[in-house]
């Protein structure tokens, strides 16, 4: 298992415009078609994923609106928890295997508890979780606004 935070934060980078409402990142997480290079160094083209993304939890519209309302340059964090092909049986997981789903649900909960350590649940940002299985392994993708509510109800930037 590998946990990776991605460089995408909503800020403009490498000559590319920003994604202040996280819409591009959300579209990547949820889309059946993705913009990727066919080969290393080649221009990006629209490619259909081998399998459609699987929504797990979170409300994309709420996260997008939250990110759009933030006054920060880096408005969201995104990443992936990727498993080796031999760690999780994709067919069983996508079929709803109770034990495997329980395992990944607990892992996502533990990840959130670690990422937001010390922050009460009611002050944490909503997390969008989607699964990708198009690489013949399970990938749990996450995205959340980089802000929490303080005890006075004000938004404060966080850096997970």
For the regions a language model picked out, list residue spans one by one.
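N-terminal nicking endonuclease/strand-transfer module with a His-rich metal-binding environment
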Residues: 1-160
């Amino acid at each position: 298992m590998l946990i990776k935070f991605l460089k995408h934060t909503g800020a403009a980078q490498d000559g590319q415009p920003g994604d202040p409402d996280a819409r591009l990142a959300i579209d990547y997480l949820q889309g059946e078609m993705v913009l990727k290079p066919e080969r290393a160094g080649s221009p990006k083209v629209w490619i259909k994923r081998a399998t459609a993304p699987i929504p797990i939890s979170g409300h994309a519209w709420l996260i997008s609106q939250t990110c759009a309302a933030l006054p920060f340059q880096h408005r969201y964090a995104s990443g992936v928890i990727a498993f080796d092909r031999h760690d999780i049986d994709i067919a069983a997981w996508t079929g709803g295997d109770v034990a495997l789903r329980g395992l990944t649900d607990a892992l996502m909960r533990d990840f959130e508890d670690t990422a937001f350590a010390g922050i009460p649940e009611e002050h944490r940002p909503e997390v969008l979780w989607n699964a990708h299985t198009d690489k013949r392994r399970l990938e749990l993708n996450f995205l959340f606004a980089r802000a929490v509510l303080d005890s006075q109800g004000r938004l404060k930037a966080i850096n997970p």
